[in-house]
């Protein structure tokens, strides 16, 4: 798998193109650099009109034969024109007790319900222990209606199961772009989708990793490493009609192995907004910009 990560056998990432981002990434520059985190996908591409899917994130891995303690967690909404189920109890309890699913807007319900059914199918004594509050799972969304037949309800139970099962075999290298829930997404008038990165906390043995499903932003505001790329592109394009006026959404899931409590994770989730702003996001009124942060460090049996 290490050889497959080399340029030529995978799509180049921003750092491969010498874009000078700050900080030191982890080994895989992905949310999976936080120990135990696993990610899976189900990608649905059919004909000319179906471009959608499901992304799964397991905070403590996919081995349900052992007890998995909940993770301390919290969340923040920069702009709330979106959906993330299960967050009322997460807020009150401070616990994340299920995997996280990300999909398209009209498929939140099937994802939420199918996750519960998936756990019931695997309902031996240990996985039932891991079902503490999994009846209120986390399922989030962004709208893929520009590239996908969003009202065709193409995500089915088997696709949710596939995303959950795929996390067992996908390994630490996380696919990006046109994959999983990100399949039909676009940002800043470019094709977008699923993205991930990580950073090592300076002078401390901690890692912060994120996974995003990006579907937001206007091209004229796109900023990369401090450079107003969007404005430059609009000046040189012959057809600079801007399709996206800023509507859209972004879901950000942040994982860390730093020992943080729920009120501290609230502060971390809130500060994701600053990163969105540096990229050119403005939290427009039609946008659903919702962020969840969790820590894998603290072990607590409830």
Region spans (language model):
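Alpha/propeptide regions of enzymes that mature by internal proteolysis
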Residues: 1-302
């Amino acid at each position: 798998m290490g050889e497959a990560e080399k340029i030529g056998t995978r799509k180049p990432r921003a750092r491969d193109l010498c874009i000078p981002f700050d900080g030191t990434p982890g080994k895989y520059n992905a949310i999976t650099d936080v120990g135990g985190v696993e990610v899976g996908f189900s990608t649905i591409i059919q004909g000319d009109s179906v471009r959608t899917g499901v992304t799964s994130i397991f905070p403590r891995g996919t081995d349900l034969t052992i007890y998995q303690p909940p993770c301390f967690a919290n969340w923040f909404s920069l702009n709330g024109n979106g959906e993330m189920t299960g967050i009322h109890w997460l807020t009150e309890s401070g616990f994340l007790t299920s995997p996280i699913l990300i999909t398209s807007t009209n498929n939140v319900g099937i994802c939420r319900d199918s996750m519960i059914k998936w756990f019931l199918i695997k309902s031996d004594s240990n996985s039932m222990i891991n079902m503490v509050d999994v009846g209120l799972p986390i399922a989030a969304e962004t709208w893929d209606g520009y590239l996908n037949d969003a009202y065709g309800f193409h995500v089915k139970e088997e696709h949710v199961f596939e995303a959950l099962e795929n996390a067992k075999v996908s390994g630490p290298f996380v696919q990006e772009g046109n994959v999983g829930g990100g399949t039909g997404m676009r940002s800043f008038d470019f094709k977008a989708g699923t993205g991930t990165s990580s950073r090592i906390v300076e002078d401390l043995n901690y890692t912060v990793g994120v996974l995003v499903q990006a579907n937001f932003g206007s091209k004229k505001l796109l900023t990369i490493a401090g450079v107003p790329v969007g404005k430059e592109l609009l000046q040189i394009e012959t057809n600079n009609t801007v399709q996206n006026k800023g509507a859209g959404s972004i879901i950000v899931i942040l994982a860390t192995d730093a020992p943080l409590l729920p009120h501290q994770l609230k502060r971390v989730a809130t500060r994701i907004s600053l990163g969105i702003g540096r990229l050119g996001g403005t939290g427009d009124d039609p946008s659903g910009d919702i962020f969840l942060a969790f820590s894998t460090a603290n072990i607590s049996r409830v």
